[in-house]
């Protein structure tokens, strides 16, 4: 893709926020002890425009972040080239374990994936967050793409994987 096309497909800040708000799953990359990349699919919270995760305090990703807080997060969508879009965030992860932040992240995750939060849900959210930490991603670089901006004709879903979609 040429330089002009790259500039054409970039999402603005509002488009990025809307895309992240509507999407469901992110891929989180952390670095293992020997430098290997540890990739995991994660549900996430979106708080004040920032991506947050919740995870077990002793999970491999939490161990990796404590050792090396550099992370990458990608959220992507689209099954044909003309509809590919996504956001990739490079940044620093901060482990947060204060009760107010944990509850805020827990409520956001609950609402994104289960439905409206009410006071009756509090025991479920508390249980969900038991022995967990929140992870805040502080971005240092954000890249985005939306191939729909290229104005290509609709492409059919085809190939050996099409039958499984």
Regions found by a protein language model. Name each.
Residues 20-21, 66-67, 129:
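Alpha-helix boundary recognition
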Residues 12-15, 38-40, 58-60, 121-123:
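A generic local structural motif
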Residues 2-11, 81-165:
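Charged, gly/pro-rich active-site loop segments
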Residues 23-57, 63-65, 72-77, 85:
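Short beta-strand segments
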Residues 2-27:
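Short, basic/aromatic recognition patches
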Residues 26, 51, 71, 93-94, ...:
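Short beta-strand segments in beta-sandwich/barrel cores
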């Amino acid at each position: 893709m040429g330089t002009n096309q790259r500039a054409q497909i970039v999402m603005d800040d509002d488009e990025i926020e809307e895309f992240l708000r509507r999407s469901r799953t992110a891929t989180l990359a952390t670095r293992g002890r020997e430098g290997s990349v540890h990739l995991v699919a994660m549900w996430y919270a979106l708080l004040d425009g920032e991506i947050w995760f919740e995870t077990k305090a002793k999970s491999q990703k939490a161990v990796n972040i404590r050792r090396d807080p550099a992370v990458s997060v990608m959220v992507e969508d689209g099954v044909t080239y003309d509809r590919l879009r996504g956001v990739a965030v490079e940044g620093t992860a901060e482990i947060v374990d204060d009760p107010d932040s944990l509850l805020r992240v827990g409520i956001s995750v609950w609402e994104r994936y289960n439905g409206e939060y009410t006071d009756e849900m509090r025991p479920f959210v508390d249980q969900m967050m038991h022995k967990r930490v929140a992870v805040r991603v502080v971005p240092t670089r954000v890249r985005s793409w939306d191939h729909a901006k290229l104005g290509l004709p609709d492409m059919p879903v085809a190939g050996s994987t099409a039958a499984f979609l």
